[in-house]
Amino acid sequence: MKTCEWCGELEAVPGRNTVYWELPDGTRAIELTDTPAMVCSSCGMTYQEENTVKEIEDQLLLIQTKKLPESLTYQQLMETERILKRNYFDFS
């Protein structure tokens, strides 16, 4: 168990959920199913950890998003062929 980022209780466990993500160009949103998440049994919140958010955001910057279907799994998104090797705009 991990500490919940929302309520601070030591009740968060790994899970999966469906999320909706706006593409970087703002033209539309896609549905990502089976996305890694944390689920807190104390407050009921389900959320993505920062590293998962960064992975999704980076991948969406590195692929041709116009070819993406309206819905796909997290794994399918991460396996989509990249047109750049890495996110050159990430200075962290």
Curated annotation (Swiss-Prot):
It comes from the Bacteria. This is Uncharacterized protein YokU.
